[in-house]
């Protein structure tokens, strides 16, 4: 007899995403900005442009993309101290993940010698901040590139394809999609999945928190993530359709 599906605090089914939404233009001076919300998790994502590249990148006509990630002080139940002189290992890991994922779907040659700077600042953390950051940052990046093309700054579209990320967990033997904190903190397995629009994987981050997991359990979690990512990508396209200056509909 199969184990009963764990009850989720917010009433969702095992295969349901948290509510997903995007609020546009919270910042007047950024090239592109938005607040992405997945349930109670909210991340401010913004894109800025620099007409330069890192020194080691100069002279070859190619651009660059860099990402920064921070938890704002009031984003968690206990205040997060600002990371000033030294970043925590977690912060460094996450911002590298964000930058690495976005660069994988970006044509650096099409940028010319310019740098796109991505900032992801967590306003409220209820788990899934890294996946929300990636999903929201891609939307902001897509719009920024559309605006740069409309202004004549870019002559080619540097974005090769879509990108999104989601978490999956295993609780009491049952795969659950898009964990909130109450689930993430007790999951037997925590898995973050990043994929491109064509379905190919960009990154898997999986950890057995309590006990090893099987190949069949991994496959079940990946299948669940795939369905959630398709839905998130629809949400991305819908968000872009509501924003001026985007080519996606």
From Swiss-Prot:
Single Gene Ontology BP annotation: rRNA catabolic process
Keyword Glycosyltransferase: no
Reaction equations catalysed: tRNA(n+1) + phosphate = tRNA(n) + a ribonucleoside 5'-diphosphate
Residue positions binding phosphate: 90, 128-130
Keywords (A to Z) from UniProt: Nucleotidyltransferase, RNA-binding, rRNA processing, Transferase, tRNA processing, tRNA-binding
Record-linked InterPro entries: ExoRNase_PH_dom1 (IPR001247), ExoRNase_PH_dom2 (IPR015847), ExoRNase_PH_dom2_sf (IPR036345), PNPase/RNase_PH_dom_sf (IPR027408), Ribosomal_Su5_D2-typ_SF (IPR020568), RNase_PH (IPR050080), RNase_PH_bac-type (IPR002381), RNase_PH_CS (IPR018336)
EC number: 2.7.7.56
Enzyme class at the top of the EC tree: transferase
Highest rank taxon of the organism: Bacteria
Membrane-spanning residues: none
Gene Ontology MF: a single term: tRNA binding
Gene3D superfamilies tied to this protein: GHMP Kinase, N-terminal domain
Keyword RNA-binding: yes
Described function: Phosphorolytic 3'-5' exoribonuclease that plays an important role in tRNA 3'-end maturation. Removes nucleotide residues following the 3'-CCA terminus of tRNAs; can also add nucleotides to the ends of RNA molecules by using nucleoside diphosphates as substrates, but this may not be physiologically important. Probably plays a role in initiation of 16S rRNA degradation (leading to ribosome degradation) during starvation.
Subunit record text: Homohexameric ring arranged as a trimer of dimers.
Entry's family note: Belongs to the RNase PH family.
Name of the molecule in the record: Ribonuclease PH
Species this chain originates from: Parasynechococcus marenigrum (strain WH8102)
């Amino acid at each position: 007899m199969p184990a009963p599906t764990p009850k989720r605090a917010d009433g969702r089914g095992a295969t349901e995403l948290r509510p997903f939404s995007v609020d546009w233009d919270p910042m007047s001076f950024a090239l592109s900005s938005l607040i992405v919300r997945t349930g109670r998790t909210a991340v401010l994502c913004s894109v800025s442009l620099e007409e330069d590249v890192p020194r080691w990148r100069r002279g070859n006509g190619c651009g660059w993309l860099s990402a920064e990630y921070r938890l704002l002080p009031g984003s968690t139940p206990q205040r997060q101290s600002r990371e000033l002189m030294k970043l925590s290992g977690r912060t460094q890991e996450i911002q590298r993940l964000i930058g690495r994922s976005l660069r994988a779907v970006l044509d650096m040659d099409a940028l010319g010698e310019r740098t796109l700077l991505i900032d992801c600042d967590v306003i409220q953390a209820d788990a899934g901040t890294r996946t929300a950051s990636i999903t929201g940052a891609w939307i902001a990046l897509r719009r920024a590139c559309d605006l740069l093309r409309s202004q004549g700054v870019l002559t080619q579209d540097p974005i090769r394809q879509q990108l999104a990320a989601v978490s999956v967990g295993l609780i009491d033997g049952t795969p659950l999609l898009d964990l909130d904190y109450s689930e993430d903190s007790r999951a037997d397995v925590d898995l973050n999945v990043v994929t491109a629009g064509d379905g190919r994987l960009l990154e898997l981050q999986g950890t057995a928190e309590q006990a090893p997991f099987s190949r069949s359990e991994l496959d079940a979690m990946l299948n669940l993530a795939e369905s959630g990512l398709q839905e998130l990508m629809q949400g991305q396209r819908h968000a872009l359709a509501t924003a001026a200056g985007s080519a996606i509909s």
